[in-house]
C-alpha cells in the first residue's frame, strides 16, 4: 500500500531559523518551533511517515564547517528520538544556489527515490515548509503542500488539518459492457449524484448514501438495451472498490456493524470489514422486477459489492411488499456501514495487525 509521507523542512519549520546568518551552527541557537513535538507524535500515530528535507548553504565549507552543523543537528535528532519521533530519512543539500545542482530545493533529486512507482500516496502526502521553495518542491513532486507560519499555520493548525477525517476514493471502471465513474467521500454528508440509467437502482443507491452518512457520485453508461445485469454488477464492483480504497488501512474504524430495524419489513444486516469477502443472503420476492430493476440482481449486487469491498456481509429481510423488502436491505446495509466505518481511535481493530 502507498505510504502517507510528510517531507518536512528543517530551519524555520522544525526549529527556529536565526536571522543573523540563517545557520544553526551552535547548540545555543537550537530552538524547537512551538508545538512541534506533540504535533509530530500525533501525525506519526495517524500513520504519516516523516522525511526531513533541508537546504544547508555551503555545508562542509569554511563558511559552514560540517562539525558546526553536526553538533546542534545531532542534539535535535536526539531530542526527537527521546520523544519517540523518528524520521525515515534526513535529506540535506549542501550546495549554494549558484552551484545550480539538482538536489537543492525546489529540485527533486534528493526525494526522487520516493517518487518511484506507487511508493507514496500522492493525494495524502505533503511538503511542509516555511519558504516558497518548499511549495515549489511539492509542486514538482506532484503532491500537496502546507506553508508553515508560526502565527497563521503553526504545528497545531497543521496537525488539526492533517488529522481531520477526509477519506475519499475515485474509481473508474471501463469494460466492453459498461463505463463507470465512482467517487466516495466517507466523511462528508452531502447530496449524492447518482445516474445508472436504472431509476429504482438509483433510488436504492441513494438509500446507502443517506443511511451510511457518506456522499457518492456515480455515473454509469451500460448496455441496458440487453438487460440490467452488467450495469448493476459493475456498479457494485466499482462502488465496493471505492469504499475499500477510501477506508485505507482501516486504523481506528469500528470494523463491525449490526442493525435490526423494525418497519413494514424486518431487515437484518451484520457487516465485518475483515478483508475476507463473504455473503449470506436471505430474501424472497413475488415478482421479477421492482420498477425497472430485476429483483434477482439485488443479491448479485451485494455479492459483487462484498467481494470488491472485501467484507463479510449477512443480509436478511422479511415482509410482504417487494419494494419495501428490497429497500429495507439497502437501508439496513447503509446503517450498518455507518457503524463499521466510524473512526473512534488510532488502533487497528485486529489482533493480526492487518485488515487487508
Swiss-Prot record:
What EC number(s) does the entry state? 3.1.3.15, 4.2.1.19
State whether keyword Cytoplasm applies: yes
Residues the record marks as active site: 9, 11
Q: Where in the cell is it found?
A: Cytoplasm
Q: In which pathway does it act?
A: Amino-acid biosynthesis; L-histidine biosynthesis; L-histidine from 5-phospho-alpha-D-ribose 1-diphosphate: step 6/9; Amino-acid biosynthesis; L-histidine biosynthesis; L-histidine from 5-phospho-alpha-D-ribose 1-diphosphate: step 8/9
What SUPFAM superfamilies does the annotation carry? HAD-like (SSF56784), Ribosomal protein S5 domain 2-like (SSF54211)
A Gene Ontology biological process term: L-histidine biosynthetic process
Extract one GO molecular function annotation from the record: histidinol-phosphatase activity
Cellular component aspect of the GO annotation: cytoplasm
Does Transcription regulation appear among the keywords? Answer: no
What this protein catalyses is: D-erythro-1-(imidazol-4-yl)glycerol 3-phosphate = 3-(imidazol-4-yl)-2-oxopropyl phosphate + H2O; L-histidinol phosphate + H2O = L-histidinol + phosphate
Question: So what family is this one in?
Answer: In the N-terminal section; belongs to the histidinol-phosphatase family. In the C-terminal section; belongs to the imidazoleglycerol-phosphate dehydratase family.
Name recorded for this polypeptide:
Histidine biosynthesis bifunctional protein HisB
Amino acid at each position: 500500500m502507498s505510504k502517507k509521507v510528510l517531507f518536512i523542512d528543517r530551519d524555520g519549520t522544525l526549529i527556529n531559523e536565526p536571522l543573523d546568518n540563517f545557520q544553526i551552527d551552535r547548540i545555543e541557537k537550537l530552538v524547537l518551533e512551538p508545538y512541534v513535538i506533540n504535533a509530530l507524535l500525533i501525525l506519526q500515530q495517524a500513520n504519516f511517515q516523516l522525511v526531513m528535507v533541508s537546504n544547508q548553504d555551503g555545508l562542509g565549507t569554511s563558511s559552514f564547517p560540517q562539525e558546526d552543523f553536526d553538533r546542534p543537528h545531532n542534539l535535535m535528532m536526539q531530542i526527537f528520538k527521546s520523544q519517540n519521533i523518528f524520521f525515515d530519512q534526513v535529506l540535506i543539500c549542501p550546495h549554494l544556489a549558484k552551484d545550480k545542482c539538482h538536489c537543492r530545493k525546489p529540485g527533486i533529486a534528493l526525494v526522487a527515490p520516493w517518487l518511484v512507482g506507487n511508493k507514496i500516496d500522492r493525494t495524502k502526502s505533503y511538503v511542509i515548509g516555511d519558504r516558497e521553495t518548499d511549495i515549489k518542491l511539492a509542486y514538482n513532486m506532484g503532491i500537496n503542500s502546507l506553508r508553515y507560519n508560526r502565527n497563521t499555520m503553526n504545528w497545531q493548525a497543521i496537525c488539526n488539518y492533517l488529522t481531520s477525517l477526509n477519506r475519499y476514493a475515485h474509481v473508474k471502471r471501463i469494460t466492453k459492457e459498461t463505463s463507470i465513474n465512482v467517487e466516495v467521500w466517507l466523511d462528508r454528508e452531502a447530496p449524492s449524484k447518482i445516474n445508472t440509467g436504472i431509476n429504482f437502482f438509483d433510488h436504492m443507491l441513494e438509500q446507502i448514501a443517506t443511511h451510511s452518512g457518506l456522499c457518492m457520485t456515480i455515473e454509469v453508461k451500460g448496455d441496458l438495451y440487453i438487460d440490467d445485469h452488467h450495469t448493476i454488477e459493475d456498479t457494485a464492483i466499482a462502488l465496493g472498490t471505492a469504499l475499500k480504497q477510501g477506508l485505507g488501512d482501516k486504523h481506528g474504524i469500528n470494523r463491525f456493524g449490526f442493525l435490526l430495524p423494525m418497519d413494514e419489513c424486518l431487515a437484518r444486516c451484520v457487516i465485518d470489514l475483515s478483508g475476507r469477502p463473504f455473503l449470506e443472503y436471505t430474501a424472497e420476492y413475488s415478482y421479477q422486477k421492482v420498477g425497472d430493476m430485476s429483483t434477482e440482481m439485488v443479491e448479485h449486487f451485494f455479492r459483487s459489492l462484498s467481494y470488491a469491498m472485501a467484507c463479510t456481509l449477512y443480509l436478511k429481510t422479511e415482509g410482504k411488499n417487494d419494494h419495501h423488502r428490497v429497500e429495507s436491505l439497502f437501508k439496513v446495509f447503509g446503517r450498518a456501514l455507518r457503524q463499521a466505518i466510524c473512526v473512534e481511535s488510532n488502533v487497528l481493530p485486529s489482533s493480526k495487525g492487518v485488515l487487508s
